[in-house]
């Protein structure tokens, strides 16, 4: 797109905005880029703040232009242009929202502003006609009374206090805000001589006041919109604060419980179940080993004692036999055969009986050892099982 065409369209837009008395700054860079954010404020000002007549027409058509996003705002604007202004833009709604089409968008904005100004003139002229007709009727009634009474050419006015005021000027000035004090009645004939210049001044004053009123209302509406937008954020923050306070309370309770547990558990040692079971199994094994070692020691001592006793008994048996053999030819009679036989028989029997006891004790110790082995095997099997608790 040529830069000359853009500059020409921007100049046209500046001229129209001067006629429209646009108070805010224009984003020329955004308009050149085709950014819709630069043109939407101008359109909203033309429809809502420029003319009270146009705003009344929009309110009567039940179209809302405030508190909407860009897409809904453009939908409402296109509907107004179609129904009330008989204007169809060159671009579609999607094209207008997108970036680009700068020259076409500037042209559409200029056309919208011209349509609004034209509609303002039409509506203002329609409201001026009935007021002028009323003034003509009132002036027609006052002319014969003035000719009959031959009132001088001095202008007659009415002060706010209700009294008649005369001035040296030829043109009359009527103050509109009239009220009666002390039941003073004022005739309509005295208020009739009003010139066309005064009418123009009054209409311009009315237009100025009516145009200024929406400018005062717009900030109020914006403030309400901001409050509406801020209220959900405030509620969300309040909920977050309440949740944080609840969590802080829970943390304080947990800290108190931990302190109580620390005080109760002072001097106590915490051990895991698995480690405790392992310790118990090891202790049982050690106890069994100690018992087995003691029994083995006793068995060894017992065997040593038996061996000592056996050796002593054998020595005793051998010594008297030799003595008997040596002393027999000298001093032993024949009758002593029975006694020697009896004396020889007793220690042999005792040795035999003692050997039988040794065999019995060995058998009992072997059985005990077998039982202990079984106990060890059972404990080993129990320790292999992980789910078993002693």
Curated annotation (Swiss-Prot):
Modified residues (Phosphothreonine): 346
Keywords, comma-separated and alphabetical: Coiled coil, Cytoplasm, Cytoskeleton, Phosphoprotein
Phosphoserine PTM sites in chain numbering: 331, 345
Keyword hit for Phosphoprotein: yes
GO cellular component: centriole; centrosome; cytoplasm; midbody; spindle pole
Spans annotated as Binds with microtubules and centrioles: 11-195
The protein's name in its UniProt record: Centrosomal protein of 44 kDa
Region Disordered, residue ranges: 323-347
Subunit structure: Interacts with CROCC. Interacts with POC1B; the interaction is direct and recruits POC1B to centriolar microtubules. Binds to centriolar microtubules.
Biological function: Centriole-enriched microtubule-binding protein involved in centriole biogenesis. In collaboration with CEP295 and POC1B, is required for the centriole-to-centrosome conversion by ensuring the formation of bona fide centriole wall. Functions as a linker component that maintains centrosome cohesion. Associates with CROCC and regulates its stability and localization to the centrosome.
GO biological process: centriole replication; centriole-centriole cohesion; centrosome cycle
Top-level taxon: Eukaryota
UniProt keyword annotation of NAD present: no
PANTHER family: CENTROSOMAL PROTEIN OF 44 KDA
Molecular function via GO: microtubule binding
Lineage of producing organism: Eukaryota, Metazoa, Chordata, Craniata, Vertebrata
Cellular compartments annotated: Cytoplasm, Cytoskeleton, Microtubule organizing center, Centrosome; Cytoplasm, Cytoskeleton, Microtubule organizing center, Centrosome, Centriole; Cytoplasm, Cytoskeleton, Spindle pole; Midbody
Low complexity bias spans: 335-345
């Amino acid at each position: 797109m040529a830069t000359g065409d853009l500059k020409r369209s921007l100049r046209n837009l500046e001229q129209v905005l001067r006629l429209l008395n646009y108070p805010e700054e224009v984003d020329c860079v955004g308009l050149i880029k085709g950014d819709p954010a630069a043109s939407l404020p101008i359109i909203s000002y033309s429809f809502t703040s420029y003319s009270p007549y146009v705003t009344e027409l929009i309110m009567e058509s039940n179209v809302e232009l405030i508190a909407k996003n860009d897409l809904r705002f453009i939908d409402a604007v296109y509907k107004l242009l179609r129904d009330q202004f008989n204007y169809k833009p060159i671009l579609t709604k999607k094209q207008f929202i997108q970036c680009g089409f700068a020259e076409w968008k500037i042209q559409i904005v200029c056309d919208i502003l011209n349509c609004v100004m034209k509609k303002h003139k039409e509506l203002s002229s329609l409201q001026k006609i009935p007021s002028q007709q009323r003034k003509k009727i009132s002036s027609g009634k006052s002319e014969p009374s003035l000719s009959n009474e031959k009132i001088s050419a001095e202008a007659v006015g009415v002060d706010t206090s209700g009294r008649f005021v005369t001035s040296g000027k030829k043109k009359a000035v009527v103050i509109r805000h009239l009220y009666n004090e002390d039941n003073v009645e004022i005739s309509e004939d005295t208020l009739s001589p009003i010139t066309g210049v005064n009418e123009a001044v009054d209409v311009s004053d009315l237009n100025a006041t009516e145009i200024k009123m929406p400018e005062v209302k717009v900030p109020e509406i914006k403030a309400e919109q901001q409050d509406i937008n801020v209220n959900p954020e405030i509620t969300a923050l309040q909920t977050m604060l309440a949740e944080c306070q609840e969590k802080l309370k829970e943390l304080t309770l947990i800290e108190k419980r931990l302190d109580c547990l620390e005080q109760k558990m002072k001097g106590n040692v915490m051990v895991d179940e698995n480690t405790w079971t392992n310790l118990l199994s090891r202790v049982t094994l050690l106890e069994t080993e100690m018992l087995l070692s003691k029994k083995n020691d006793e068995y060894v001592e017992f065997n040593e004692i038996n061996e000592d006793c056996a050796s002593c008994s054998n020595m005793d048996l051998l010594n008297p036999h030799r003595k008997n053999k040596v002393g027999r030819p000298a001093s032993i009679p024949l009758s002593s055969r029975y006694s020697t036989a009896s004396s020889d028989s007793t220690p042999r029997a005792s040795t035999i009986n003692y050997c039988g006891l040794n065999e019995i004790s060995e058998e009992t110790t072997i059985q005990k050892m077998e039982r202990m082995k079984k106990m060890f095997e059972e404990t080993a099997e129990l320790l292999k099982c992980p789910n078993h608790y002693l």
